[in-house]
């Protein structure tokens, strides 16, 4: 699993145009031939393009300067210089390109093969043969190539998932993601094992669901405590919230209320999303009793009890995920 980056700042530079050539035709039987300097090639452009198999911006590093190729100068015999190669920068779907200087949204790259030319390369200069006239038969000058441009941009990737697994640290979100998808999210028995969102694909027949394991939320996250609001904005992009509760803990109801309060504090729109509550760790002592209490306390809320260790309730949960997804 690559490191997840939700935003990165880079500078892109388009290529300079090649200079026009000053040249005169010199042949065995034509010692004083006319001007024949060719045009310079165009500089390469900078293009952002969506690639299907990318899911993060981790390929790019903050502060990187990425340059397209310069055009080549013109040559004699009216030969044009080669154009500089375009610089194509591949990004995942749902990447937004901003002007870093003023924050303007330049383009939103959503779908496979979407592309955006952020900077065009400089034009090549004209060779001296272009400047020959009836009164100026021997032009001893040519145009320089047009300079390329540079731009500092911010790339932002919005994590888009059908279902977001939301819970306090160590609630079992990563283990659940690993169980129901082919993801390999890190699992350990200490808080904040998941420090970046992980995505997994849940497949069933002809249906696919993208499941996101969001880093653990703690009290005050909506105000920047813990991993803060950095990933709450990604939760806002998911269609359905799956609140994962460690049902073996004595304070399971408090955990549930903390999650709701943080979602509500961040935005009412987020709080009002469709939800399913997952009571995890039913295999541990006292969990069954707590599970019954949770169902009574939540009333009409949809609650599914599971044990990842015993593979219990997993099929029912997957079924509920697909049922909820079809309501959109």
Swiss-Prot record:
Every OBG-type G domain range: 161-326
Keywords: Cytoplasm, GTP-binding, Hydrolase, Magnesium, Metal-binding, Nucleotide-binding
A GO biological process held by the record: ribosome biogenesis
Classification via Pfam families: GTP1_OBG, MMR_HSR1
Binding site for Mg(2+): 174, 194
Molecular function GO terms recorded: GTP binding; GTPase activity; magnesium ion binding
EC number: 3.6.5.-
Function in brief: An essential GTPase which binds GTP, GDP and possibly (p)ppGpp with moderate affinity, with high nucleotide exchange rates and a fairly low GTP hydrolysis rate. Plays a role in control of the cell cycle, stress response, ribosome biogenesis and in those bacteria that undergo differentiation, in morphogenesis control.
PANTHER family per the UniProt record, alphabetical: DEVELOPMENTALLY REGULATED GTP-BINDING PROTEIN-RELATED, MITOCHONDRIAL RIBOSOME-ASSOCIATED GTPASE 2
Similarity comment text for this entry: Belongs to the TRAFAC class OBG-HflX-like GTPase superfamily. OBG GTPase family.
Protein name in UniProt: GTPase Obg
Organism for this UniProt entry: Borreliella burgdorferi (strain ATCC 35210 / DSM 4680 / CIP 102532 / B31)
Higher taxonomy: Bacteria, Pseudomonadati, Spirochaetota, Spirochaetia, Spirochaetales
Gene that produces this protein: obg
